[in-house]
């Protein structure tokens, strides 16, 4: 088992990474007599709910669960209310623990429920998708969507543990694996050129879910994110770099309707647009743009803007992005692979030109 620590003083927590961890009582920060509410969805529940419940009951916990509809389109206040109702009906108090068992959607909703219920209860992340394991389960971002924008209602709320069982990836559809690799590639692109080079060498091993490479990859991603979160927990500066591709990607998700493109797919295209824009602004070399496109393609990820979306369709969604300050668009761009920066008030004509360039790829 590998362990990465997120260092936040009294709110520090471990990220456990390994095979078969769901049935290991020692990784759960729980004790006899604790009440637990597991938040999951029916697909994940059929694989893992029973075994986790058995493990927690062996510890001596009282365990209940609530199952939410599946998909990004259900990351809503209505789903949040289902969790609150389940907690209240079962008389859960401020000493309860909420466990998020699922992908990024479940983690985001359950985390926001934990942050909100009776002004905050203990929260444990058990991410079951690659995207959630390397990104959304770490760092304390929780949220639900609004019809006008993604993740517009939320809070920073850290878990007390993240438990990553890499065997859960074996039950995922291949499309979900590929989507998760977008966030993996992002880490190399923004902060770690050596990791990017490692990914170029081992991307086929990761697609094939070879455990040795998977665990090494997940641990590296978690360490990069943990280091950034330690330095900038609430995204006042450096943490914004983790949003490479996300401003464009969120525009795609919102415009097409949540769930039509997976988050990682939209981020992949968003990273490609950001790379092309960086090149047009005189920063990123054409060779680095080509390397990024090749790696995304090897991960079976899209690099072209959706056929049904015009360049002008992006801007209204992008102006609702949480990084916008004083009405000015702020974008994460690249000087080189492994070196990202935040650009302020980039000329919209350059932005539109980059989107159009990526539209021509389709």
From Swiss-Prot:
It catalyses: 7-phospho-2-dehydro-3-deoxy-D-arabino-heptonate = 3-dehydroquinate + phosphate. Pfam families: DHQ_synthase, DHQS_C. Its cofactor is Co(2+); Zn(2+); NAD(+). GO terms for cellular component: cytoplasm. GO terms for molecular function: 3-dehydroquinate synthase activity; metal ion binding; nucleotide binding. Binds 1 divalent metal cation per subunit. Can use either Co(2+) or Zn(2+). Gene3D superfamilies: 3.40.50.1970, Dehydroquinate synthase-like - alpha domain. Its EC number is 4.2.3.4. Pathway: Metabolic intermediate biosynthesis; chorismate biosynthesis; chorismate from D-erythrose 4-phosphate and phosphoenolpyruvate: step 2/7. The keyword Nucleus does not apply. Its main location: cytoplasm. It comes from the Bacteria. SUPFAM superfamilies: Dehydroquinate synthase-like (SSF56796). Keywords: Amino-acid biosynthesis, Aromatic amino acid biosynthesis, Cobalt, Cytoplasm, Lyase, Metal-binding, NAD, Nucleotide-binding, Zinc. Zn(2+) binds at residues 183, 246, 263. One of its GO terms (biological process) is aromatic amino acid family biosynthetic process. It is found in: Cytoplasm. The keyword Iron-sulfur does not apply. Disulfide bonds: none annotated. Belongs to the sugar phosphate cyclases superfamily. Dehydroquinate synthase family. Catalyzes the conversion of 3-deoxy-D-arabino-heptulosonate 7-phosphate (DAHP) to dehydroquinate (DHQ). NCBIfam families: aroB. This is 3-dehydroquinate synthase.
């Amino acid at each position: 088992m590998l362990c990465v620590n997120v260092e936040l003083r009294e709110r520090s927590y471990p990220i456990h990474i390994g095979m078969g961890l769901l049935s290991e009582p020692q990784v759960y920060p729980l004790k006899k007599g604790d009440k637990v509410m597991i938040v999951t969805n029916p697909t994940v529940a059929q694989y893992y709910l029973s075994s986790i419940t058995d493990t927690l009951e062996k510890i001596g916990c009282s365990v209940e669960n609530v199952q939410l509809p599946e998909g990004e389109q259900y990351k809503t206040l209505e789903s949040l209310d289902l969790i609150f109702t389940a907690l209240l009906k079962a008389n859960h108090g401020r000493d309860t623990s909420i466990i998020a068992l699922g992908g990024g959607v479940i983690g985001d909703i359950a985390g926001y429920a934990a942050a909100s219920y009776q002004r905050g209860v203990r929260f444990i992340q058990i991410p079951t998708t690659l995207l959630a394991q390397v990104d959304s389960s770490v760092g304390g971002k929780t949220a639900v969507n609004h019809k006008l924008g993604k993740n517009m209602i939320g809070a920073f709320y850290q878990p007390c543990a993240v438990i990553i069982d890499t065997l859960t990836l074996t039950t995922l559809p291949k499309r979900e694996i590929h989507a998760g690799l977008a966030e993996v590639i992002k880490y190399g692109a923004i902060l770690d050129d050596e990791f990017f080079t490692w990914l170029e060498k081992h991307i086929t091993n990761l697609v094939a879910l070879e455990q040795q490479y998977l665990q090494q990859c997940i641990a590296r991603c978690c360490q990069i994110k943990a280091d950034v979160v330690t330095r900038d927990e609430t995204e006042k500066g450096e943490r914004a770099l983790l949003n490479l591709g996300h401003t464009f990607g969120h525009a795609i998700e919102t415009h097409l309707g949540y769930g039509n493109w997976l988050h990682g797919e939209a981020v992949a295209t968003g990273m490609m647009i950001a790379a092309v824009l960086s090149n047009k602004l005189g920063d990123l070399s054409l060779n680095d743009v080509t390397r990024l496109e090749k790696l995304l393609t090897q991960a079976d990820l899209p690099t072209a803007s959706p056929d049904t979306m015009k360049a002008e369709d992006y801007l209204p969604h992008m102006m609702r992005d949480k990084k916008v300050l004083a009405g000015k668009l702020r974008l994460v761009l690249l000087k080189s692979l492994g070196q990202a920066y935040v650009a302020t008030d980039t000329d919209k004509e350059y932005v539109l030109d980059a989107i159009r360039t990526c539209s021509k790829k389709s």
